Amino acid sequence: MSKEKTPRALKDNEAKAVARMLRISPQKLNLLAQLIRGKKVERALAELEFSRKRAAFDVRKTLESAIANAENNHSLEVDDLVVAEAFVGKALVMKRFSPRARGRSGKIQKPFSHLTIVLREVAVAAQA
């Protein structure tokens, strides 16, 4: 009995890519989303390439997918793209049990995340 989802309509100068069910916790993935938010796509790709975080590969793949969507589906100029939004949502949490001493059990939680990246084409001011 949750509210109806209202999808955010993309503007003409925007493109989006979504990665669902990434096997990493939302808190860890959000660190990388904060890293690329508001940056030009070339800079964001460079930062992700040299990041030592495990999720950097998944974020980079999603960003490259958003760039391809912008270029092929929306006919946007790749050099003018900026990461307008990069946000993380919680997905399901798989619960497992690990046997412990004296017949007890410990709870293991394996969280999943959704990653959404929205790119926006920003007009470059004319050089005089």
From Swiss-Prot:
<dbReference type="GO" id="GO:0019843">
    <property type="term" value="F:rRNA binding"/>
</dbReference>
<comment type="subunit">
    <text>Part of the 50S ribosomal subunit.</text>
</comment>
<dbReference type="InterPro" id="IPR001063">
    <property type="entry name" value="Ribosomal_uL22"/>
</dbReference>
<dbReference type="GO" id="GO:0022625">
    <property type="term" value="C:cytosolic large ribosomal subunit"/>
</dbReference>
<keyword id="KW-0689">Ribosomal protein</keyword>
<comment type="function">
    <text>This protein binds specifically to 23S rRNA; its binding is stimulated by other ribosomal proteins, e.g. L4, L17, and L20. It is important during the early stages of 50S assembly. It makes multiple contacts with different domains of the 23S rRNA in the assembled 50S subunit and ribosome.</text>
</comment>
<protein>
    <recommendedName>
        <fullName>Large ribosomal subunit protein uL22</fullName>
    </recommendedName>
</protein>
<comment type="function">
    <text>The globular domain of the protein is located near the polypeptide exit tunnel on the outside of the subunit, while an extended beta-hairpin is found that lines the wall of the exit tunnel in the center of the 70S ribosome.</text>
</comment>
<dbReference type="GO" id="GO:0003735">
    <property type="term" value="F:structural constituent of ribosome"/>
</dbReference>
<dbReference type="InterPro" id="IPR005727">
    <property type="entry name" value="Ribosomal_uL22_bac/chlpt-type"/>
</dbReference>
<dbReference type="InterPro" id="IPR047867">
    <property type="entry name" value="Ribosomal_uL22_bac/org-type"/>
</dbReference>
<dbReference type="GO" id="GO:0006412">
    <property type="term" value="P:translation"/>
</dbReference>
<dbReference type="Pfam" id="PF00237">
    <property type="entry name" value="Ribosomal_L22"/>
</dbReference>
<keyword id="KW-0694">RNA-binding</keyword>
<dbReference type="InterPro" id="IPR036394">
    <property type="entry name" value="Ribosomal_uL22_sf"/>
</dbReference>
<dbReference type="InterPro" id="IPR018260">
    <property type="entry name" value="Ribosomal_uL22_CS"/>
</dbReference>
<comment type="similarity">
    <text>Belongs to the universal ribosomal protein uL22 family.</text>
</comment>
<keyword id="KW-0699">rRNA-binding</keyword>
<keyword id="KW-0687">Ribonucleoprotein</keyword>
